[in-house]
């Protein structure tokens, strides 16, 4: 699964996903992309499931760029543990996705194939998304 090789801090503060994206708002690498219409924390399993769905549909033709990466550790305390006594242990890795972020890009396939591949990826993600073309968004 996706996770950073090393981090400066083991247990970071929770970064907000509210508001609009500052970067990654335009398609830079491919011809088509998947844009987030909401903000959310997307974990490494969801990103990997979306990537696998796209590659299987495209039958390994074309090229896929993942523009998000799960850099942030999410912590959780065990069940039935009293409040206090410190922050919980790292549970999973998440990417902070804000509204307007381009999450995936696709190239070297026709529009119909790219649209369907990105639609399949959309269903693996916990937020609303839309298909965009280069120069259109």
From Swiss-Prot:
Record keywords: Ribonucleoprotein, Ribosomal protein, RNA-binding, rRNA-binding, tRNA-binding
GO CC term, one of those recorded: cytosolic large ribosomal subunit
Gene3D superfamilies, alphabetized: Ribosomal protein L10e/L16 (3.90.1170.10)
Pfam families (alphabetical): Ribosomal_L16 (PF00252)
Record GO terms (molecular function): rRNA binding; structural constituent of ribosome; tRNA binding
An individual GO BP term: translation
UniProt cross-references to InterPro entries, sorted A to Z: Ribosomal_uL16, Ribosomal_uL16_bact-type, Ribosomal_uL16_CS, Ribosomal_uL16_dom, Ribosomal_uL16_sf
CDD domains: Ribosomal_L16_L10e
Stated role: Binds 23S rRNA and is also seen to make contacts with the A and possibly P site tRNAs.
Family: Belongs to the universal ribosomal protein uL16 family.
Subunit structure as annotated in this protein's UniProt entry: Part of the 50S ribosomal subunit.
Protein name, as recorded: Large ribosomal subunit protein uL16
